[in-house]
A protein has these predicted regions:
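Glycine- and small-hydrophobic-enriched helix-loop-helix hairpins
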Residues: 1-94
Length: 98
C-alpha cells in the first residue's frame, strides 16, 4: 500500500520493519534494506536471504522490470491473505470437531 501511495521502497521498508514480530524476518529485512541502499535490486536482495519463495521473488523481479512492483506486491499480499484465511478455516473446522 505504501508503494501504491508513492512512497519509495526504502521508506516503505523502514515503515514496515517495526511492525514485524518475528526477529528472524526483522534481521533479514534489515539486511535486504541495506543491500537495496547499496544498489542491489529488491528481488536480488530478497533472493539472497530466502524470505519469500522463489516464485514470489521471480514475480517481484518481473514487477521491477515492468515498473509494476506495487501491483505485484499487492498480488503477493492477497495470495498470502488467502492462504492464511484457508488455514484458519481448517483450524476452526478441527476445533469444532472437539
Amino acid at each position: 500500500l505504501l508503494l501504491q501511495g508513492g512512497v519509495n521502497l526504502l521508506s516503505a521498508l523502514n515503515d514496515a520493519i517495526p511492525l514485524i514480530d518475528n526477529p528472524v524476518y526483522i534481521k533479514q529485512l534489515k539486511q535486504v534494506r541495506k543491500e537495496i541502499s547499496e544498489g542491489k535490486s529488491f528481488s536480488d536482495a530478497l533472493a539472497q536471504f530466502k524470505i519469500f519463495p522463489d516464485f514470489f521473488v521471480q514475480m517481484i523481479r518481473v514487477g521491477e522490470e515492468g515498473g509494476r512492483l506495487d501491483s505485484i506486491l499487492a498480488d503477493i499480499s492477497e495470495s498470502y491473505d488467502k492462504e492464511i484465511e484457508g488455514d484458519l478455516k481448517i483450524v476452526v473446522r478441527l476445533l469444532n470437531r472437539l
